[in-house]
């Protein structure tokens, strides 16, 4: 029997209430939580000793076939769009747009009362629950915040300034307030050569305690194959130094892509500012310069003589959302998510769209590594205690995402931003360090897919025995380097081209080669493991190649989810299939810097690159 629930009176009767739209036979969204449940959640979190930030969130319940006028010129409004699409109608840049006029301001004014009512209601709820540590007065309203009224005014920003004052009068001085700006929004908007620091009146408001940024800037430009620029920076796209370095480097800082064609060809245009020598105003990744400099608007491209109201360094920055989808190459576009019902459905640049929980973890680790290092940022800039990881779901795992007949968005979990069910997993380097420490050993390991839920160690053994099991799973070669063991990612990094005249002359042939029998190459592999999503029951995952060949069965004492198990099985099958072709050659003493795991190519051997698996001296 269900427990009795409290009855609440609302301002809308059941008859008058608007029903959430349907999709695929069920509700498109969950309902808005009741006031009682919000108060109870706040009280429960506070009782656990946690600080609470309340975050009113706008979802767009606009189904397909809505027939609504599309401000962007389409036949109707896009299905279930991002709230950042809300704008004036027609939208800026469209024929007949009221952008830059009093008519645009009037449209914004018509929207604001309903929005204010929602935010003020949650402010009152927070007080009724005994108060909260922080509150956001909105997030990612990019399309509205950038709408210009007459005289280059920004009416929605003005409304946010007023709203912040009204929320402050409700919650009092103890609750911190901010607005969570989109990463493309926080530092201003640029139109037709003009630049406006349009949110500065809000950031400068005495009622706003911090600059909020939903920080989904690209941290990678990774591609498959051998011919891409970032392979010179890292062996794999999972490396923390590569990802953390790209927080203030690369796309959006040093350069940009002027077109989709340029992106495909990796033709990068440098970010410059030839007139005033302020390239940082065009760099959305240059958080430090934005925070530490005065801001001068450039209406019509002409720099104002006087700065905006922003006082450099006056308030900390909160990263109100960080993370990325658990999807192949998620770091290329951390803001992208998969949702088949939504017009926003997509996959990151150059992604296969397959699940990859490891890149999600690595993006979070990179942010924490970067922003918790005091040597890399001015004091007081980014508050390392305000890195909000997106997102943890209150629905119970694994019932969510498994019961898709109850929660239709469960199918999105595999590649989505959810941390639920994944936060306890480890990258291979983390697990390797933990295992080695049990044996008082030192290991240097790189992060390699998949994300691992755990590894069973049974019976007596050495650190090498345990680590070899782990590295077999993740495709790393275990080597010795001084007093440490080293895990070197196989099949990764740039290959060095060797010329035949660089090979050593010995009594044996300069180069010998053995080709494997194609009929012996495995075409199928099954991987036995423990299934994290099914209460750690024994499970198998399969990988199949289109060729004809034998079946390989491999069992490993590891805990994986279904996506990680498929990743591992496919990599193991590729490794078995590639292992038949071998070459052997000798190098002079000047080439002794090679290690197992390094890759080389040789002229006229198109099957390369070849990976060094063994080195013999003498």
Regions found by a protein language model. Give the residues of each.
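Second-shell loop/turn segments in exported
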Residues: 27-30, 109, 150, 353-354, ...
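Aromatic-rich peripheral "rim/lid" segments of glycoside hydrolase catalytic domains that contact
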Residues: 84, 88, 329-430
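Acidic, His- and aromatic-enriched active-site or binding-groove loops in soluble protein domains
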Residues: 72-98, 156-166, 170, 203-214, ...
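Noncatalytic carbohydrate-binding groove/subsite architecture in carbohydrate-active enzymes
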Residues: 96-134, 139-337
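Well-ordered, non-membrane alpha-helical segments in soluble/globular domains
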Residues: 28-39, 112-121, 154-165, 192-198, ...
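C-terminal extracytoplasmic interaction modules
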Residues: 416-618
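Substrate-binding cleft and catalytic face of glycoside hydrolase catalytic domains
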Residues: 2-152, 170-184, 393-407
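A solvent-exposed, charged loop/short amphipathic helix patch at secondary-structure junctions
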Residues: 3-29, 74-108, 226-282, 328-365, ...
